[in-house]
Amino acid sequence: MNRITETFDRLAAKKEKALVGFVTAGDPAIETSEAIIRAMCEAGIDILELGVPFSDPTADGPVIQRSSQRALANGTNLQTVFDMTATLRKTFQGPIILFSYYNPIFRYGAENFYRDAKQAGADGVLVVDLPPEESAELTSCWKGDDFALIRLLAPTTPDGRIGAIAASASGFLYLVSMTGVTGSSGLDTTHIADLCAKVQRHTALPICVGFGVSTADDVAKIAQHADGVVIGSAFERLIEESIGKPDIAGILAERTREYKAATKM
C-alpha cells in the first residue's frame, strides 16, 4: 500500500480528515524553510505539498507569488526541492507531493524529474497547468509505477469532464473551492457539500478541497464533506508576516495544530 492510500485509510479509521499543507520550498531561506516545514509536519500536517518556486505562477495569488519570488531570489531550484524532499523524508512518514508548474519540469526533463523526485522520496506530483490531454510525456515516465498524479478540479468543471479528469488521476483529487487564484478571499463553504457530492458521483478517489481556506472554522466546515483540506496561502501569509522572528518555525507549528484539531470529526 502506498503512503497516500495508507494515510487516508489511517485517518478514516480515527475519524479524521487529512490536513494537506502547502509550503513553497526555500521560502524565506532554504535552511529556514526546512526548519519550518519540519515543525509543521511534527505539528500535524498529514500530506505535504512542497511547492516548486516559479517566476510566473499564474494560478497563484500575490501571497504565493511573493513566496516564489523570495525562494527564487535565494537560489531555490528543482535540485534544491529534491534535496529538501530527501531531508524531510528522513523524519516525515506522510506523503510528499511536489507542486509545480510544467515549465520547470519541462526544462529539467520529464524523465529526469521523475527519476530524481522518486529517488528523493516524493510520492507524486501536482502540475498546475498540465491538462490530461497534454500529460503523456510526463506520465509515460512512470507508467506502472506507484507515483501519484494529482489532478485539479474547478467548481465550473462540467460533469462530463470530471470523469475524464478523475480517470487520469491517482492519489487524490484537489477540488478548488472557488474560481480565481489561490488565497482569494470570501470563501463560502455552504456549497462545498454539493461540490464534493458532484465529484464523488464520478470517482472513488479521495477529495481534498482548497483555495481560500484560512481559519480553523473553514477547515471544520469543509472537513464535514471532503476527505482532506488544503491550506497554502494562509501558511505562506503567516511565514511572510513572521520573517525575521526567531521562533518562526514555532509560530507555523502552532497554527498547524489549530488547523489539525479542526479536522477531527
From Swiss-Prot:
**Active site: which residues?**
49 (proton acceptor), 60 (proton acceptor)
Q: Which reaction does it catalyse?
A: (1S,2R)-1-C-(indol-3-yl)glycerol 3-phosphate + L-serine = D-glyceraldehyde 3-phosphate + L-tryptophan + H2O
User: Which InterPro entries has this protein been placed in?
Assistant: Aldolase_TIM (IPR013785), RibuloseP-bd_barrel (IPR011060), Trp_synthase_suA (IPR002028)
Enzyme's top EC category? lyase
GO CC term (a single one): cytosol
Which parts of the chain span the membrane according to its record? none
Alphabetical list of SUPFAM superfamilies matching this protein: Ribulose-phoshate binding barrel (SSF51366)
Identify the Gene3D superfamilies for this entry.
Aldolase class I
Pathways involved = Amino-acid biosynthesis; L-tryptophan biosynthesis; L-tryptophan from chorismate: step 5/5
EC number, as in UniProt: 4.2.1.20
User: Which UniProt keywords are listed?
Assistant: Amino-acid biosynthesis, Aromatic amino acid biosynthesis, Lyase, Tryptophan biosynthesis
Q: Name one GO molecular function term.
A: tryptophan synthase activity
NCBIfam families linked to this entry: trpA
Say which family it is in: Belongs to the TrpA family.
**Function text:** The alpha subunit is responsible for the aldol cleavage of indoleglycerol phosphate to indole and glyceraldehyde 3-phosphate.
Quaternary assembly: Tetramer of two alpha and two beta chains.
Record's protein name: Tryptophan synthase alpha chain
Q: Which gene encodes it?
A: trpA
